[in-house]
């Protein structure tokens, strides 16, 4: 899908650019992992306490102030235990995010094949500046989720600030 729009600031053409993460084998069943992501308030629970003040969330939306920019995400569609689609909501650029919760296979038959796809409206300069960083960030999210499903927490993560009951019965991710 390629759309052509005039950017309001730079007056240059923007194109829908697609980024896709690698696939990660999460050791949690799709239904359980999916339920962790359905409520946007769960994302606030994962933040350190000192960062939560800049983030507001309800079931369908989450907004934050990041380096002076307000950015928001809204759930566009939920397909139970399969995917969640998010769209920009008050963000300075148009984007669409899809989180996939596919059934695992082989050694991970009871787990989830998790991956993320992002489409963002970027001009050529922004695409060149951000392209690799977006892909790296998506891959890091997948790796962190896979590691967490195997009991390895990210560096600097303080479990005492995490409320696992928000993620379906206290079992964590």
Please identify what each model-predicted range represents.
Residues 146-173:
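Short, highly charged C-terminal tails/helix-capping segments
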Residues 17-23, 61, 70, 96, ...:
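Intrinsic-disorder/low-complexity, polar/charged segments enriched in Ser/Thr/Lys/Arg/Asp/Glu/Gln
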Residues 23-27, 74, 100:
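Generic structural detector for well-ordered beta-strands
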Residues 4, 8-56, 172-173:
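Hydrophobic ligand-binding cavity/cleft-lining segments
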Residues 44-45, 53-92, 171-172:
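Glycine-rich portal/gate segments that line the openings of hydrophobic small-molecule binding cavities
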Residues 33-37, 43, 62, 75, ...:
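Hydrophobic pocket/interface hotspot
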Residues 90-143, 147:
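Beta-strand/loop substructures that line and gate deep hydrophobic ligand-binding cavities in soluble
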């Amino acid at each position: 899908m390629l759309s052509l729009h005039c950017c309001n600031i730079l007056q240059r053409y923007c194109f829908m650019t697609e980024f896709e993460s690698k696939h990660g084998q999460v050791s949690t069943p799709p239904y359980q992992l999916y339920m962790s992501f359905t409520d946007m308030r769960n994302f606030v629970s994962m933040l350190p306490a000192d960062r939560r003040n800049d983030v507001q969330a309800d079931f369908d939306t989450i907004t934050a102030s990041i380096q002076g920019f307000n950015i928001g995400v809204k759930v566009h569609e939920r397909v139970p235990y399969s995917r969640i689609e998010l769209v920009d909501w008050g963000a300075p650029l148009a984007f669409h995010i899809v989180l996939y919760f596919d059934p695992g296979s082989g050694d991970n038959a009871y787990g989830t094949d998790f991956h993320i796809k992002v489409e963002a409206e970027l001009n050529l300069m922004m695409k060149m500046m951000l392209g690799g960083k977006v892909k790296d960030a998506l891959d890091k999210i997948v790796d962190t989720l896979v590691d967490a499903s195997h009991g390895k927490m990210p560096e600097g993560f303080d479990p005492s600030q995490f409320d696992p009951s928000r993620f379906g019965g206290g079992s964590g991710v």
